[in-house]
């Protein structure tokens, strides 16, 4: 946990922003894999962690704004339960460590909420993303499950986004720790991978590093020779000479702050000419985008700039043609880059995504596009000091998508389908780093990690 005063001040700020009513923040429950006592690793809700800090299941945090009081509802472990789990600190001591003096049994929550409803208090809660949260809220509010979806509090969402978007110095330190562990995971992948090993073997080594550092993965590792499939995970496929490996991974610290880095490397230790040409295009787009990071710059503009650089690079290879800006405005580049340039990062890898992209990544002036590729951009609004963002351009050659576009000569004035044939099986290349926006620009997070094609080859050659 952070210092007690950090949690106290966070809740005061939230109380002031919301103004009145009752804020209900649900912690997560344990989740069973296949029977009650065989559990998935517990992961606390990120907003509960941000305001209440206690990493324990089945807790509910209440901020009663009108009465200026805070309550945690939950139960201590029984002696019988601790035979199986080991000692668990009493909840009143944990609550005291984050500045909450009132602790009540979970069973008292129903009468508390019923009284709040009878007094016509405004009850603020976040959209639930787990079925058990959904059912609990419906039960507490005395409404049907079907009617709950329209009842969540937009004012609470906006208030939480406004707080969690700006990372404090202690949060940056924690994120930097996560990125350092993530860099160690990537270094292991680049140096250990050999033809004949499986993707899963490498992913297992990476997870070992994350757990050994005191945390876990911040998301399931993407370690694949099919990098054109954006979230392909890993398999038991053998690493094969001539292929590229796209490695996108993240570590999470013990306090659940995330890292997220991507590197692409050749199984054969050196890139082929075609692979290196495309890799250098991606790397140039990455550097060009990073140079634009600064407060006030809409991230959508950074994304579109990177798209233009990717397009210009493909034009030099003869794969694309025409005016680069026009090609991007028409969405021709999305055949090769059908996703966004990056996202916010913090307690979640895609920070606060459960609260809604329209609130986290957009604003009243900048709305989500419906265009293929651009509609997948998670962050578009102007950057501000204290934001933590990823920058992750890539080029992806998906044969199924290429065939579909070519069959219709889709945007054929910008794409040379004949030249593209030489690249259709290249798979995918992505380079990703994490940045904090500073007063005058940005700063890369984490220890240095090989990034250029030459640096990658030096590591591969050992």
Can you say where each PLM-predicted feature lies in the sequence?
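Active-site neighborhoods and metal-handling regions in enzymes and metal-associated proteins
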Residues: 1-462
């Amino acid at each position: 946990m952070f210092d007690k005063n950090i949690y106290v001040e966070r809740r005061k700020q939230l109380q002031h922003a919301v103004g009145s009513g009752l804020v209900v923040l649900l912690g997560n429950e344990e989740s069973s894999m296949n029977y009650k006592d065989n559990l998935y690793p517990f992961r606390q809700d990120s907003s509960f962690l941000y305001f209440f800090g206690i990493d324990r299941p089945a807790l509910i945090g209440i901020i009663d704004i009108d009465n200026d009081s805070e309550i945690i509802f939950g139960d201590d472990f029984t002696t019988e339960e601790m035979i199986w789990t080991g000692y668990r600190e009493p909840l009143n001591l944990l609550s005291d460590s984050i500045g909450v003096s009132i602790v009540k049994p979970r069973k008292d929550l129903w009468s508390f909420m019923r009284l709040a409803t009878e007094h016509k208090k405004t009850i603020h809660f976040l959209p639930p993303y787990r079925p058990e949260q959904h059912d609990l809220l419906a039960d507490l509010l005395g409404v049907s499950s079907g009617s709950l979806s329209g009842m969540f509090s937009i004012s609470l969402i906006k208030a939480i986004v406004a707080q969690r978007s700006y990372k404090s110095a202690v949060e940056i330190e924690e994120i930097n720790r996560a990125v350092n562990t993530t860099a160690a995971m990537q270094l292991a992948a680049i140096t250990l991978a050999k033809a004949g090993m499986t993707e899963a073997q490498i992913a297992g080594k990476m997870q070992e590093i994350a757990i050994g550092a005191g945390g876990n993965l911040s998301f399931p590792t993407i370690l694949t020779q099919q990098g054109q499939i954006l979230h392909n995970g890993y398999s038991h496929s053998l690493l094969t000479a001539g292929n590229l490996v796209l490695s996108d991974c993240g570590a999470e610290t013990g306090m659940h702050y995330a890292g997220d880095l991507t590197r692409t490397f050749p199984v054969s230790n050196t890139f082929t000419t075609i692979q290196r040409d495309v890799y250098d295009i991606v790397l140039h787009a990455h550097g060009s985008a990073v140079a634009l990071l600064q407060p006030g710059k809409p991230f959508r503009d950074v994304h579109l700039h990177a798209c233009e650089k990717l397009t210009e690079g493909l034009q030099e290879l003869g794969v694309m043609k025409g005016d680069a800006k026009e090609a991007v405005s028409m969405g021709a580049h999305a055949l090769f880059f059908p996703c966004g340039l990056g996202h916010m990062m913090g307690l979640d890898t895609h920070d606060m995504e459960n609260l809604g992209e329209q609130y986290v990544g957009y604003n009243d002036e900048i709305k989500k596009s419906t265009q293929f590729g651009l509609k997948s951009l998670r962050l578009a609004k102007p950057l501000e000091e204290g934001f933590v963002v990823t920058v992750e351009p890539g080029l992806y050659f998906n044969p199924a998508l290429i065939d579909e576009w070519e069959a219709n000569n889709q945007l054929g004035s910008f794409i040379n389908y004949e030249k593209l044939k030489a690249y259709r099986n290249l798979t995918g290349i992505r380079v990703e780093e994490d940045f904090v926006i500073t007063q005058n620009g940005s700063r890369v997070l984490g220890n240095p990690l090989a990034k250029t094609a030459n640096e990658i080859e030096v590591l591969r050659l050992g």
